A protein has these predicted regions:
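Selective transmembrane helix interface/packing segments
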Residues: 1-280
Length: 280
């Protein structure tokens, strides 16, 4: 560790060190914000389902059960982490890490404002789609490493479904690039009447284009923009294996799907990655 710190001290200028420190702080802020959003979504989902079923839902821990997700998270962290005897232990250990890392890596290029993003990549959309598709690898690893029929079948179902809907999601996202081109947004900047503008893959530039024209592309290019948004929303639900596209986790057939053999902290990583991908 000391050698690493000495290397940084001798090779980084104060300006570079400050820039890297700001990136690390920004990443930690995003991680904390997404984690809080995951907790809020989990509580809200449970309360809505409870009221739909004429129940109250979580009510005991905190006012109206607001602290129930924190209690559940603590319970998962304290539970025994069991690894099946015949599992491929290295792959079994790596699978949830691959899934959660890919889910959070997509936030690197997602803008939270005109200038607020970890980095502004000129291929931001391609980066997001590419990294999100890597989550399929972690799911297949989880199913294979468990050395059980049910997780393997669940992982194969999930990977097939995710690959299938990535085509529709990609086409819907490409429509945003076409809309920026029609709005006069070029690769090198924004300006009305951009002439030979060919659109941009930078997500910050797409956000600025809509901000400058004071209207979302969904409404400006109605009904095509609304149709593209609808296709993206449906594909997103299918990509995250949420109802009604939760076939990989069909309880009547495959119990919990590809993470049947996981428990404790490793199971919570799959849970966190699923909700983080939904928010992204």
């Amino acid at each position: 560790m000391s050698d690493f710190l000495n290397y940084l001290n001798s090779n980084l200028t104060p300006g570079q060190a400050g820039a890297y420190l700001w990136v690390v702080i920004y990443i930690l802020i995003i991680f904390a914000a997404v984690s809080v959003a995951v907790i809020a979504m989990n509580w809200l989902e449970r309360k809505i389902l409870a009221h739909m079923q004429v129940r109250l839902g979580p009510m005991r821990v905190g006012p109206h059960g607001l602290l129930q997700p924190f209690a559940d998270a603590l319970k998962l962290l304290l539970k025994e982490d069991i690894i099946p005897a015949n599992a491929d232990k290295l792959v079994f250990w790596m699978a949830p890490l691959v899934v959660v890392i890919t889910a959070f890596t997509t936030y690197i290029v997602i803008p939270f404002g005109p200038t607020h993003a970890v980095t502004d990549m000129n291929i931001g959309i391609l980066f997001m789609l590419g990294v999100a598709s890597l989550g399929t690898l972690g799911i297949i690893m989880a199913g294979w490493a468990s050395n059980s029929h049910y997780p393997l079948l669940g992982s194969l179902r999930s990977s097939a479904q995710m690959v299938s809907y990535e085509v529709a999601m990609g086409m819907a996202v490409v429509s945003a690039v076409l809309m920026t081109s029609l709005s006069g947004v070029g690769v090198y900047g924004i300006g009305p009447g951009g002439g030979d503008a060919i659109g941009t893959l930078s997500m910050i530039e797409i956000v600025r284009a809509q901000m400058n024209q004071h209207v979302w592309f969904i409404f400006k290019f109605f009904p095509l923009g609304l149709a593209a948004f609808g296709i993206f929303a449906i594909a997103m639900v299918a990509e995250t294996n949420r109802a009604p596209f939760d076939l990989p986790e069909a309880e009547s057939e495959l119990t919990a799907g590809f993470h049947t053999e996981y428990s404790g902290f490793r199971w919570s990583l799959f849970f966190l990655a699923e909700y983080a991908a939904m928010i992204a």
